[in-house]
Amino acid sequence: MKPDAHHVKQFLLRLQDDICQTLSAVDGANFVEDSWRREAGGGGRSRVLRNGGIFEQAGVNFSHVHGDAMPASATAHRPELAGRSFEAMGVSLVVHPHNPYIPTSHANVRFFIAEKPGADPVWWFGGGFDLTPYYGFEEDAVHWHRTARDLCQPFGDDVYPRYKKWCDDYFFLKHRNEQRGIGGLFFDDLNTPDFDHCFDFMQAVGNGYTRAYLPIVERRKAMVWGERERNFQLYRRGRYVEFNLVWDRGTLFGLQTGGRTESILMSMPPLVRWEYDWQPEAGSPEAALSEFIQVRDWI
């Protein structure tokens, strides 16, 4: 089957609706929608939930942009894309909870197609989800990775290990020499064996996010926390900001293509702190995080 961008777009719009409804039901607060247009072509729907019962900020963004020429960030590694028009669409979300015992979560699914007359289209899917805890709980990590493995299983025994490793490699702060969190799944440039197979997998990842995350939220939301835990959460959120602004390809692509800055930076935590050369107290729960986020096989 030839690539069907319209079909993908309809799924992504439904996915945004489903995730927002699910998160709102858990939190009790509603998302505010901001529809926007891109002068160079396309637009999107940005939805943000602020200061809810559980989530300090949750952003779920749909975007569909198109243009006559590829940006430098895309053609640098793929010269075959030069001179092609393109469409890029996706749903991207980040959830920052109030409670430091609830991890931050991120998910993204996307589709890209570039075309020119007289040539076959160049297309691929990408996406994944990853978890960033502030205090580590093994049962949460096992559940997160088991959900990821189970959704990958129908697509082959090698899919979960491959995309888990890719996630571990991608969400790594080189300047800190540390992982951003405990990973999950990350895939990109997926275009084999055919469109239907790849689209099915992207849908499985998108639909699997809430199954992976919400049981963890339910387990941790009633845990009591105070100023110490909050300060550590804000400090660790700094790593999130550093990764997104320095290393994340999606952020750089969005800014280089003239994307909507407010939507691109919606992933940023609402509050964050840096402290020069801060070190956790030896033997403390905060000190245990550095070991907890080391790459390992959770299941």
UniProtKB/Swiss-Prot annotation:
Involved in the heme biosynthesis. Catalyzes the aerobic oxidative decarboxylation of propionate groups of rings A and B of coproporphyrinogen-III to yield the vinyl groups in protoporphyrinogen-IX. Residues 240-275 are annotated as: Important for dimerization. Its main location: cytoplasm. Substrate binds at residues 92, 108-110, 258-260. The record marks 175 as: Important for dimerization. Gene3D superfamilies: Coproporphyrinogen III oxidase, aerobic. The active site is at 106 (proton donor). Disulfide bonds: none annotated. Its cofactor is a divalent metal cation. GO terms for cellular component: cytoplasm. It holds the Pfam family Coprogen_oxidas. The keyword Chloroplast does not apply. One of its GO terms (biological process) is protoporphyrinogen IX biosynthetic process. It is an enzyme of class 1 (oxidoreductase). A divalent metal cation binds at residues 96, 106, 145, 175. This is Oxygen-dependent coproporphyrinogen-III oxidase. Belongs to the aerobic coproporphyrinogen-III oxidase family. Keywords: Cytoplasm, Heme biosynthesis, Metal-binding, Oxidoreductase, Porphyrin biosynthesis. Pathway: Porphyrin-containing compound metabolism; protoporphyrin-IX biosynthesis; protoporphyrinogen-IX from coproporphyrinogen-III (O2 route): step 1/1. Its EC number is 1.3.3.3. GO terms for molecular function: coproporphyrinogen oxidase activity; metal ion binding; protein homodimerization activity. HAMAP family: Coprogen_oxidas. InterPro entries: Coprogen_oxidase_aer, Coprogen_oxidase_aer_sf, Coprogen_oxidase_CS. It is found in: Cytoplasm. Homodimer. PANTHER family: COPROPORPHYRINOGEN III OXIDASE, MITOCHONDRIAL (PTHR10755), OXYGEN-DEPENDENT COPROPORPHYRINOGEN-III OXIDASE, MITOCHONDRIAL (PTHR10755:SF0).
